[in-house]
Design a protein with these regions (language model features):
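Beta-rich nucleic-acid/ligand-interaction surfaces
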Residues: 119-126, 245-248, 280-282
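Helical (often loop-to-helix) elements that flank the catalytic cores of nucleotide-handling enzymes
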Residues: 251-272, 295-305
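Conserved phosphate/pyrophosphate-binding and hydrolysis machinery centered on Walker-type P-loop NTPases
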Residues: 89, 122, 212, 363-370
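Conserved two-metal-ion catalytic palm core of "right-hand" nucleic acid polymerases
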Residues: 1-170, 175, 186, 377-431
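Conserved polymerase palm-domain catalytic core
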Residues: 114, 135-241, 245-264, 280
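Mobile genetic element proteins and their domesticated derivatives, centered on retroelements
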Residues: 75-76, 100, 211, 215, ...
């Protein structure tokens, strides 16, 4: 049975819903998915897919089918001047493609090596961090870290299709559908003014389309041979989508492996981001996926801390303007700021939102960066409550911060450690 047939199975949708809501899932997404399932929103989309497969031109283009074109948008991150291009399908089609991706990643997970950590069932980036930490003599090894430049949108579709054909040989209908999506050259460009014919349709090379659900499966598949090559030779290596790190006992071995990565990517039509290429010595430690390894300890990477502090500063400035404009007290603004960041940093009981304490706490082994964030957060709240950045802000005492809702990351981390140790002890007693 083709995976496409499961897209019409209500029981399959319920399993998907139960899975998503069991994880760190935004509440808004859970509500939208529930409404979509209750309304059987997949039915029109499955009809579009059937029409696509029945259309004789589908193998070449989606031009005369009912499946919509993806929309293109160029977005910029607040923390940098860099822009990136993302693609999205309309909400109903996007939701169906999310289920299809979920099914794909599970059925074909056996294609991938154990050193790949992106978008895999039961595996997270934290598993990569933990495995690297357990690698024998990792603190004495030379490291190489690389980032693939614009990976998703740079994958040459003509090179991916033979790999996809081999992987999905037993499901020709699925292969036909996915090939049609990949080879469709047209997109809707929101930056192009509307013309009489609809006007936003442009033609371009778009790779595997960053932002679309299926790109996760393609990103894993396209470099699986490189992953396997390092795994078979026992070289410490990890890949999370476009982020790569590897280790060697000598600088010469490390450099040879780095050259191998560069050559492999070049053969696949890809290139490395030179600004993110790092050759490390044992005494340097290394950072990977938001974590920093140094002298046998794991902490939050400096770049992650910097990004959070920038967000805190922007929010504090915005709330300072807000309370002055509204004629409200500084304490009102301080309390509002704390509510925003408490939601980001701490998961509430029964809350499935992804938060810092769920992501970082189980992995880090020291609290230096948590302490740095605590001090910065206290300063932002004192500024809002006192209405000044002068020394007068220290008139706002620590007890005042706690009354407004402040929670210390360091304190919460130690409490979490105690809970983890107690739970582990209880489990050992039971066994």
């Amino acid at each position: 049975m083709s995976l496409l047939e499961q897209l019409s199975d209500e029981a399959c949708w319920e399993r998907f819903y139960n899975y998503k809501t069991s994880l760190s899932c935004p509440k808004t997404f859970a509500k939208e998915l529930r409404r979509f399932i209750d309304a059987r929103g997949w039915e029109p989309v499955c009809g579009e897919i059937r029409d696509c497969l029945n259309a004789p031109v589908f193998e070449k283009t989606l031009q005369r089918t009912t499946f919509p074109l993806p929309s293109k948008a160029v977005i910029s991150k607040q923390s940098s001047q860099k822009k990136r291009t993302v693609y999205t399908y309309p909400a109903p089609e996007n939701t169906v493609l999310k289920l299809l991706t979920w099914l794909l990643l599970r059925k074909y997970d056996g294609l991938f090596s154990g050193n790949l950590y992106s978008f895999r069932p039961g595996i997270t980036a934290k598993d990569a961090v933990r495995r690297l930490r357990r690698t024998k003599d990792i603190n004495r090894m030379y490291s190489y870290k690389a980032d693939i430049s614009n990976y998703f949108n740079s994958v040459p579709v003509e090179k991916l299709l033979p790999m996809l054909s081999e992987a999905l040989a037993e499901d020709p209908a699925l292969l036909n559908f996915l090939s049609g999506l990949l080879t469709e050259p047209r997109v809707l460009d929101g930056s192009v003014p509307h013309a009489p014919d609809g006007g936003r349709v442009v033609t371009e090379q778009k790779g595997i389309m960053a932002g679309t659900p299926l790109s996760a499966f393609y990103a894993n598949l396209y470099l699986k041979d490189m992953d396997r090559s390092f795994a078979e030779r026992g070289i410490p290596y990890a890949r999370y989508s476009d982020d790569i790190i590897l280790f060697a006992k000598t600088a010469e071995e490390r450099d040879a492996c780095a050259s191998e990565v560069g050559h492999f990517l070049a053969e696949r039509g890809l290139s490395l981001n030179p600004d993110k290429e790092v050759f490390g010595a044992p005494e340097d430690g290394f950072t990977f996926l938001g974590f920093e390894f140094q002298e046998g300890y794991i902490d939050i990477a400096p770049v992650s801390v910097t990004k959070l502090k920038k967000k805190m500063r922007r929010k504090a400035r915005a709330l300072d303007r807000w309370h002055r404009r509204k004629g409200l007290s500084g304490e009102k603004a301080a309390a509002a700021c704390l509510r925003v960041f408490n939601r980001k940093l701490f998961a509430a009981e029964g809350d499935n939102e992804l938060s810092w304490n769920r992501w970082f706490f189980p992995v880090i082994t020291r609290t230096d960066r948590l302490h740095e964030i605590d001090l910065y957060a206290q300063d932002c709240i004192r500024f809002l409550a006192a209405g000044t950045r002068t020394k007068a802000r220290f008139d706002v005492r620590y007890e005042d911060l706690k009354r407004l809702g402040y929670r210390s990351l360091v304190h919460e981390w130690y409490e979490n450690e105690v809970k983890e140790r107690n739970a582990q002890s209880a489990q050992e007693i039971q066994t």
